[in-house]
Each structure stands twice: as structure tokens, then as C-alpha cells.
């Protein structure tokens, strides 16, 4: 199955979501098996309907998109994703320069909507085709399919990278160059797991460690210098 990146039209309209706490990208995965299950059940084939009903329920859980209250803290960098911190390491980013990379692993049970780590202007959203290796393998940040979103904040630059994995083969990015983001605002998602990396300037007071659980748009992962 080939990977694919989806983009919105840019601006607020491109980032519009459904009113229900479910990401709009999830409805086909929820409604189609639900309709099949209903049809089978109505025709008396209830046992055959069960797998489709289960698939619909699982998709409803996967594509959940709860409302979040983002803290208003000066110079704070919010987690761009739900998950577990798998790496905190010095790195060099083409946009940020000398940086600290905070890598977050998203399991299939996590919320998979990505959120802006800080308020600022999207300078670019750069997609790169690549492999679909497991998210925990070293070096996948440079070899896997990914989309890097470069954000110019009030005082610093930050890069967020959506990285596809073995099961996650569709990156959804709803922003483009020139869009403005607020801290904690939704900007995309990675379907069915994988990893989100956040590059912050070196010297940032990193507030998380490997193994910590983080919540997108809520957990402060660092304070800018």
C-alpha cells in the first residue's frame, strides 16, 4: 500500500473539522463498516455483522478528537501529539538550526490529531516520500515518509515532523505556507499510529524525559530561551 499525504486548502477552512469529537478523516472508516454491520444484522446475519461493528467501534476510538484547553504560558512549547516520549536528543534542523529533538511515539490507542506546539506563522510544510519502517528504529526521521511543518513563533523557530510508520501510511497535513496557527490548534493527523518529532532551539528548558506520557496541546514539553 503506497503512502499518501493529504492537504487541506490552507487557512482556517482547510483546518475545519466536524462538530462531533471525531476527526473528519475518520468518518469513512466509521460509517462504512457500521452500514455493512447494520445491513447484515437486519438480514438476520448477526454473527457476520459483529466484525464490521467492531471495526466501526475501533475506528471511532482511533479517530476521536477531544477538545483541549491549552495553557497560556509565556514561551511555552506544547506537545504536538499524544503519546510517549521515546527520545530527547541534540540535533540539527534545517529550519531551527542547532536544536533538541523530542520524539513522541503514538500507539494505536492514542489520539492521533496533531496540534501546534506554539503560536506562529507557518513558513513551509515540506513533504518527503520515504520508507515505512517501524517508528522506534533509529534514523527513520530521515528515511521514512514525513511532513515537516516549519513554524516561526514570536521569539523562536520550531519544526514539527509528522512521520509515517509500518501501519501509519497516510499523513494528513491541513496547513500551508502563510497560515497562522495558535498554540494547541489542530493542523493534521497521522492515520493509525507512528511518530511525531518536535525540534526546539538548543538552550530550550526541556520539561520532559524519555518514557513520559504527553498530551497534545496540553503538556508543556519545553520553555523557550
Q: What residues fall within each predicted segment?
A:
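Contiguous, well-folded functional domains in the mature portion of proteins
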Residues: 2-225
